[in-house]
Amino acid sequence: MLDPKLLRSDLPLVAERLARRGFTLDTARLEALESRRRELQTETERLQNERNTRSKAIGQAKASGEDIQPLLDEVSDLGERLDAAKARLAEVQAEWDESVAALPNLPHDSVPQGLDEADNVELHRWGTPGTFDFEVRDHVDLGAKFGYLDFEMAAKLTGSRFAVMRGPIARLHRALAQFMLDKQTREHGYEECYVPYIVNDASLTGTGQLPKFGEDLFKLEGDHDFYLIPTAEVPLTNIAREQIFTPAELPLKLTAHTPCFRSEAGAYGRDTRGMIRQHQFDKVEMVQIVDPATSYDALESMRGHAEAILQALELPYRVVTLCAGDMGFGAAKTYDLEVWLPSQETYREISSISNCEDFQARRMQARMRHPEQKKPQLVHTLNGSGLAVGRCLLAVLENCQQADGSIVIPEVLRGYMDGVERINA
């Protein structure tokens, strides 16, 4: 959520920065709501003061033996008018809050100008895409050849955009997740967490999925407002909700391996083949809760933590800085890591690392207090994939395929697979 003080003090600046995202801010509506809010606030305070004055007069009149009924009637009337003014003020405030909750984060000054992925800026590439002297198969054909990756069975069990993995491919998928967790905890200093895969609406509001993106979520039926998590970012980041940290407790670095569930409501017809876009997929998530003064250093570190996974697996990739118009709702700056897929002869997203600054923290009231400060300040929150396990699996299958259809297991994963070096057809 954006800073209400900034919205009230410099709305044109907010509108200008949001325009970089391609977002048109209805300044007239916000100005009208704020004007009405101030009027009602003033009226409420006036009526409150007037009622207090009349209430005191009742005691004085009673002590002097005067008829207090007219004063009682006046106080009663003032009370009714005050209640009505408070109700109108609450309605206007709720309308203001709803409008502000729908506003995306402001892009950082270093974010490139642009409206979509065509305007993203490549930072660098690592590794050289391999050359093959045979016809390259995609992960769907490779899985069908093995019989260990079955989309037809998944469609029978559930529907489209699901997968059944068996045997060595299921084991390779698990090995990837374990390797990622070990890398993030042992080398990069994250604390491993086990979190609920079901969260409430307050958690999703805290990280920004609600109220605007409810259609992208799987909501459970029942008396509670429960949802399947779209990413472990939601429970991990909300660990900081309504907390006040000391400087010594930060940075808080958390990681978790979870399934993620997304309706993909806006992805009809896109990436319908294979594991690129699934309703259920696994991901190792990284979250950092940090002092605002260090958040952009943390962003660079997190990018390195994600890159280290791809480098260890020897998978070619590139890093891009997302332009303002292509960033997620809560992000102030985002890097995407894109892995090379030989079957598509292009790079595809495998990790997104974002600094949300205080956007989520304001919603969650996640704060810190320096010893020299009287009031606590909002922390900054960052999140990123370290990495998407399913997409990493298909990248390994495609980049490590051999002419005979076998898959060479990356060396760093062999210890997780009892020394197996190759998956044979």
Curated annotation (Swiss-Prot):
<dbReference type="GO" id="GO:0005524">
    <property type="term" value="F:ATP binding"/>
</dbReference>
<feature type="binding site">
    <location>
        <position position="285"/>
    </location>
    <ligand>
        <name>L-serine</name>
    </ligand>
</feature>
<comment type="pathway">
    <text>Aminoacyl-tRNA biosynthesis; selenocysteinyl-tRNA(Sec) biosynthesis; L-seryl-tRNA(Sec) from L-serine and tRNA(Sec): step 1/1.</text>
</comment>
<dbReference type="Pfam" id="PF02403">
    <property type="entry name" value="Seryl_tRNA_N"/>
</dbReference>
<keyword id="KW-0436">Ligase</keyword>
<dbReference type="GO" id="GO:0016260">
    <property type="term" value="P:selenocysteine biosynthetic process"/>
</dbReference>
<dbReference type="InterPro" id="IPR006195">
    <property type="entry name" value="aa-tRNA-synth_II"/>
</dbReference>
<comment type="function">
    <text>Catalyzes the attachment of serine to tRNA(Ser). Is also able to aminoacylate tRNA(Sec) with serine, to form the misacylated tRNA L-seryl-tRNA(Sec), which will be further converted into selenocysteinyl-tRNA(Sec).</text>
</comment>
<dbReference type="InterPro" id="IPR042103">
    <property type="entry name" value="SerRS_1_N_sf"/>
</dbReference>
<feature type="binding site">
    <location>
        <position position="385"/>
    </location>
    <ligand>
        <name>L-serine</name>
    </ligand>
</feature>
<dbReference type="Pfam" id="PF00587">
    <property type="entry name" value="tRNA-synt_2b"/>
</dbReference>
<keyword id="KW-0963">Cytoplasm</keyword>
<keyword id="KW-0648">Protein biosynthesis</keyword>
<dbReference type="InterPro" id="IPR002317">
    <property type="entry name" value="Ser-tRNA-ligase_type_1"/>
</dbReference>
<dbReference type="GO" id="GO:0006434">
    <property type="term" value="P:seryl-tRNA aminoacylation"/>
</dbReference>
<keyword id="KW-0030">Aminoacyl-tRNA synthetase</keyword>
<feature type="binding site">
    <location>
        <begin position="349"/>
        <end position="352"/>
    </location>
    <ligand>
        <name>ATP</name>
    </ligand>
</feature>
<keyword id="KW-0547">Nucleotide-binding</keyword>
<protein>
    <recommendedName>
        <fullName>Serine--tRNA ligase</fullName>
        <ecNumber>6.1.1.11</ecNumber>
    </recommendedName>
</protein>
<feature type="binding site">
    <location>
        <begin position="231"/>
        <end position="233"/>
    </location>
    <ligand>
        <name>L-serine</name>
    </ligand>
</feature>
<dbReference type="InterPro" id="IPR033729">
    <property type="entry name" value="SerRS_core"/>
</dbReference>
<dbReference type="InterPro" id="IPR010978">
    <property type="entry name" value="tRNA-bd_arm"/>
</dbReference>
<dbReference type="GO" id="GO:0004828">
    <property type="term" value="F:serine-tRNA ligase activity"/>
</dbReference>
<dbReference type="GO" id="GO:0005737">
    <property type="term" value="C:cytoplasm"/>
</dbReference>
<comment type="similarity">
    <text>Belongs to the class-II aminoacyl-tRNA synthetase family. Type-1 seryl-tRNA synthetase subfamily.</text>
</comment>
<dbReference type="InterPro" id="IPR002314">
    <property type="entry name" value="aa-tRNA-synt_IIb"/>
</dbReference>
<dbReference type="InterPro" id="IPR015866">
    <property type="entry name" value="Ser-tRNA-synth_1_N"/>
</dbReference>
<dbReference type="InterPro" id="IPR045864">
    <property type="entry name" value="aa-tRNA-synth_II/BPL/LPL"/>
</dbReference>
<keyword id="KW-0067">ATP-binding</keyword>
<comment type="subunit">
    <text>Homodimer. The tRNA molecule binds across the dimer.</text>
</comment>
<feature type="binding site">
    <location>
        <begin position="262"/>
        <end position="264"/>
    </location>
    <ligand>
        <name>ATP</name>
    </ligand>
</feature>
